[in-house]
């Protein structure tokens, strides 16, 4: 055996589990040439699973006593439909936005739920397949900022589309330079107010989009780190001869955090969907 072989330290373990399976190493904070294959593939697979679940529920829907899947989907449909009606008053737009909200909620929930998979399970399987235990793999797509910001940018694109569709190019352009401070009959003041209003609108769009993606990413990233620390506690317990405190602490901490995290992943999926509906509702309303 090689003399250099050794068990990873706690910091090495965490750093390894925070690395993505990428096409090229990332050297800059923002680098659009880098593709996180793990996040992309898992997000697409879970997106397909989302569509399969909803399609299956729709295909098996009946007027009689609903099954568990149909009952669960009906509850979600009613919840999303009520929120869509509260935020988007255009019935024609709701025909697309309400189903989209349902897909977003289920999709984000499934991506968040990957955090419930044991930390080392899928990376270990991937390492066995690749015959390299150091091969990185992250399994929570929403703990990747690229995923959450991509979703937030998609919502931003829809905001722009509905602003143009509902208000027209002229109406939206007028809104961009007249809200929130209004305008003036004086040409000079009107120009100054128009520039200030446009700047405020740009700041609002940027702030909404960044916070939309960062909120989901931050919560899921933190949850992932906590699970890693609990896993380290379990590893320390396995190697410790000092008593039962570490094993008991590992079990208690893991159980409590898992139960709490079920609430977190559900709440974060709901918040992300709600913000999407609110932002799309704003695109329909005059400022």
From Swiss-Prot:
Query: Keywords on this record?
Result: ATP synthesis, Cell inner membrane, Cell membrane, CF(0), Hydrogen ion transport, Ion transport, Membrane, Transmembrane, Transmembrane helix, Transport
Q: Name one GO biological process term.
A: proton motive force-driven plasma membrane ATP synthesis
What's its membrane topology? Multi-pass membrane protein
Has keyword Translocase? Answer: no
- Which InterPro entries does this chain map to? ATP_syn_F0_a_bact/chloroplast, ATP_synth_F0_asu, ATP_synth_F0_asu_AS, F0_ATP_A_sf
Principal localization reads membrane
Query: Is-annotated flag, keyword S-adenosyl-L-methionine?
Result: no
Q: Which cellular compartments is it found in?
A: Cell inner membrane
Q: Where are the transmembrane segments?
A: 38-58, 96-116, 139-161, 187-207, 225-245, 259-279
Function in brief: Key component of the proton channel; it plays a direct role in the translocation of protons across the membrane.
Protein name in the entry: ATP synthase subunit a
Q: Which organism is it from?
A: Verminephrobacter eiseniae (strain EF01-2)
């Amino acid at each position: 055996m090689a003399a250099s072989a050794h068990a990873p330290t706690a910091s090495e373990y965490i750093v390894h589990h925070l690395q993505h399976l990428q096409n090229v190493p990332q050297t800059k904070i923002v680098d659009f040439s880098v593709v996180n294959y793990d996040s992309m593939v898992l997000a697409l697979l879970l997106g397909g699973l989302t569509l399969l679940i909803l399609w299956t529920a729709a295909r098996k829907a009946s007027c009689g006593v609903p099954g568990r899947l149909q009952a669960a989907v009906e509850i979600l449909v009613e919840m999303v439909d009520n929120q869509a009606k509260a935020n988007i008053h255009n019935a024609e737009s709701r025909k697309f936005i309400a189903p989209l909200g349902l897909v977003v909620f289920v999709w984000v929930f499934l991506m968040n739920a990957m955090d419930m998979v044991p930390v080392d399970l899928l990376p270990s399987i991937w390492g066995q397949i690749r015959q390299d235990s150091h091969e990185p793999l992250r399994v929570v797509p929403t703990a990747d900022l690229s995923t959450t910001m991509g979703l937030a940018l998609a919502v931003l694109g829809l905001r722009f589309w509905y602003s143009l569709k509902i208000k027209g190019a002229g109406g939206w352009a007028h809104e961009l330079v007249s809200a929130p401070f209004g305008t003036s009959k004086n040409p000079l003041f009107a120009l100054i107010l128009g520039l200030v209003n446009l700047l405020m609108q740009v700041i609002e769009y940027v702030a909404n989009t960044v916070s939309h993606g960062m909120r989901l990413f931050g919560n899921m990233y933190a949850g992932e780190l906590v699970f890693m620390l609990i896993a380290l506690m379990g590893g320390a317990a396995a190697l410790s001869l000092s008593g039962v405190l570490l094993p008991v602490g590992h079990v208690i901490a893991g159980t409590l955090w898992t139960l709490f995290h079920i609430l977190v992943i559900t709440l974060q999926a709901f918040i992300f969907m709600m913000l999407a509906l609110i932002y799309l509702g704003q695109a329909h309303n005059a400022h």
